[in-house]
């Protein structure tokens, strides 16, 4: 293994020197295996089973053979490349579809076949079937992983511990329907007899990112006089600013916490309850039963919900086989249903169900989430690409990058395999992004001309929800231009001719050429839907969920736990009393002691 990468590094450095590139770029890229080994050494014995697979070794040799080929050269050899390296899914609704073009990547038929073989050798399909069948694929917590059951519109039986879970799923969905229709119609009244016009969702992580993203994305389908707010940060500013915007007599607070013990969520919930009670008392209004009229819970802890004052009739359940970052399809999506209504929420579920069926039944080479994942494996593990940009060219999707950041990084940000050995390769990428065209004026410079290869997912719509002049054509012209520019680039001779035409000459031209040259061959996927409807959004999210599954299965990690978020939370619980006391501390490391003591001596809380 080490000999292979040493030779490969030498080969690429020599090649890039010939092509005029900086050798250090190639050197940095191919130090990746050594970095993985160094960082995971403390975790114990390395699990090298992935590296020994025939398909993995085949991909290593194919990278050495084709890694320096330009993407454009593939198009020159194959005029049907776009058709052969794209996949379209019918969403079974009007003219809507979901389309993936992955032709602008360093992929040819040999590489594609090897990637497909890798998925087969790693048992991806068997793992996916086990998840769909309700087996306990979350190995470290011994739990099933069944977000697919939440959008199982076929109602096929899904058995967990001998019980079909679909009855419970449908009962909660019916409960959500009844509640949201009462609120949306004005039937539900607050303490002073007024209807509800403000919804404040209090949650964090998956209890916040999903509902925020979906309500923003589906705003054209929302009830416009019902205003949704989201409070997640334990920073009191977040709650304070929301409370300034709502009339408490017309507000319902949704407390989203499975255990009803989450520190950030319960802190915010108690502040909201205190604000309501203070308001009512200050205005001479009875507080009896007020919490039950202005608070509902998304939880499984009946006792804690009752203690808080919430009527347990208005407690919406979900189950331990629903992970937080996969929970927007569950009762956690109550704020979404309040915003867009029951029928549109069912459409949202249906879009995901269509993608589930496609993923479960379609051969790998025509399977959209599979190929999206395999292209990502190719760049992450063979090109050394550590990041993934998500670039939605639709303003309604402006929160999608943050949502996918949690989905991907919390799921696959793991350094240990399910066999409890240290991983031998890079796992989950760093995910970031911004709505187009804003990102073009922020970080695209690095994507085009920086020293890192950053695979990009461009996401756009054929139809716009808002026909304003030529705005949509202008937006999509940028979408298509950016994907082309990343691939094609601009060579030195093209730059020289442009500079001559501009009136520049001599050394000035030669000095400027390197600054205006684009190497090209920067990879991108293009993902299109006809229109951003609830069904289309459901399909997009499910596509990325299954992409995460495929990559996690190949890396041999558990994509469904999140132990990495625990340590800091535990330490925070021990530090909080120290901040409340204001005393000088000495039981942490030198830096942490210094920070706490500086805070305690200067804070005036």
Swiss-Prot record:
GO terms for biological process: gluconeogenesis; glucose 6-phosphate metabolic process; glycolytic process. It catalyses: alpha-D-glucose 6-phosphate = beta-D-fructose 6-phosphate. Gene3D superfamilies: 1.10.1390.10, Glucose-6-phosphate isomerase like protein, domain 1. The active site is at residues 410, 441, 569. Keywords: Cytoplasm, Gluconeogenesis, Glycolysis, Isomerase. One of its GO terms (molecular function) is monosaccharide binding. One of its GO terms (cellular component) is cytosol. It is found in: Cytoplasm. It comes from the Eukaryota. Its EC number is 5.3.1.9. Pathway: Carbohydrate degradation; glycolysis; D-glyceraldehyde 3-phosphate and glycerone phosphate from D-glucose: step 2/4. Its main location: cytoplasm. HAMAP family: G6P_isomerase (MF_00473). Belongs to the GPI family. This is Glucose-6-phosphate isomerase. It comes from Leishmania mexicana.
């Amino acid at each position: 293994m080490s000999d292979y990468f040493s030779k490969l590094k030498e080969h690429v450095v020599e090649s890039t020197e010939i092509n005029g590139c900086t050798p250090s770029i190639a050197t940095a890229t191919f130090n990746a295996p050594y970095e993985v080994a160094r960082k995971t050494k403390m975790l114990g014995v390395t699990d090298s089973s992935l590296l020994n697979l025939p398909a993995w070794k085949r991909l290593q040799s194919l990278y050495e053979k084709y890694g320096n080929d330009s993407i454009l050269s593939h198009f020159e050899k194959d005029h049907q490349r776009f058709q052969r390296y794209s996949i379209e899914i019918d969403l079974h609704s009007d003219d809507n579809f979901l389309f993936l073009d992955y032709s602008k990547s360093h992929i040819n038929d040999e590489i594609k076949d090897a990637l497909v073989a890798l998925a087969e050798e790693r048992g991806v399909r068997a793992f996916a079937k086990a998840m769909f069948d309700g087996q306990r694929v979350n190995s470290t917590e011994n739990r099933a992983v069944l977000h697919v059951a939440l959008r199982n519109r076929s109602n096929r039986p899904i058995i967990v511990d001998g019980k079909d879970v679909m009855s419970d799923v449908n009962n909660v969905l019916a409960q959500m329907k009844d509640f949201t229709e009462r609120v949306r119609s004005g039937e539900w009244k607050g303490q002073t007899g007024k209807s509800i016009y403000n919804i404040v969702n209090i949650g964090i992580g998956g209890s916040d990112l999903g509902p925020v993203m979906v309500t923003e994305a589906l705003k054209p389908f929302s009830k416009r006089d019902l205003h949704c707010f989201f409070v997640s940060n334990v920073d009191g500013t977040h709650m304070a600013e929301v409370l300034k915007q709502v009339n408490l007599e017309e507000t319902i607070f949704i407390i989203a916490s499975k255990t009803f013990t989450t520190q950030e969520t319960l802190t915010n919930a108690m502040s909201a309850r205190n604000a309501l009670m203070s308001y009512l008392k200050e205005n001479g209004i009875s507080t009896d039963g007020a919490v039950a009229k202005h608070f509902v819970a998304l939880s499984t802890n009946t006792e804690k919900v009752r203690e808080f004052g919430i009527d347990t009739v208005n407690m919406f359940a979900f189950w331990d086989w629903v992970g937080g970052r996969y929970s927007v399809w569950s009762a956690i999506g109550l704020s979404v249903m309040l915003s867009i209504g029951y029928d549109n929420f069912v459409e949202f579920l249906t879009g995901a169900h269509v993608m589930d069926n496609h993923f479960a039944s379609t051969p790998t080479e025509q399977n959209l989430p599979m190929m999206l994942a395999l292209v990502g494996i190719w760049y992450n593990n063979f090109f050394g690409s550590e990041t993934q940009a998500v670039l939605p060219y639709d303003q309604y999707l402006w929160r999608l990058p943050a949502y996918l950041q949690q989905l991907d990084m919390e799921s696959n940000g793991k350094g240990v395999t399910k066999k409890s050995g240290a991983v031998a390769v890079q796992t989950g990428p760093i995910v970031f992004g911004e709505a187009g065209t804003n990102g073009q004026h922020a970080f695209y410079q690095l994507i085009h001309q920086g020293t890192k290869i950053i695979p990009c997912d461009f996401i756009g719509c054929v139809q716009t929800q808002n026909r304003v002049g030529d705005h949509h054509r202008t937006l999509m012209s940028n979408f298509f231009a950016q994907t082309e520019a990343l691939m094609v680039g601009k060579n030195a001779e093209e730059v020289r001719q442009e500079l001559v035409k501009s009136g520049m000459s001599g050394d000035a031209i030669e000095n400027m050429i390197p600054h205006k040259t684009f190497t090209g061959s920067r990879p991108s996927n293009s993902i299109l839907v006809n229109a951003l409807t609830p069904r289309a959004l459901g399909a997009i999210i499910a596509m990325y969920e299954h992409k995460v599954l495929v990559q996690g299965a190949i890396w041999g990690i558990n994509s469904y736990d999140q132990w990495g978020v625990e340590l800091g939370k535990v330490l925070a619980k021990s530090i909080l009393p120290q901040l409340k006391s204001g005393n000088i501390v000495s039981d942490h490391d030198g830096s942490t002691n210094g920070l706490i003591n500086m805070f305690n001596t200067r804070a005036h809380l």
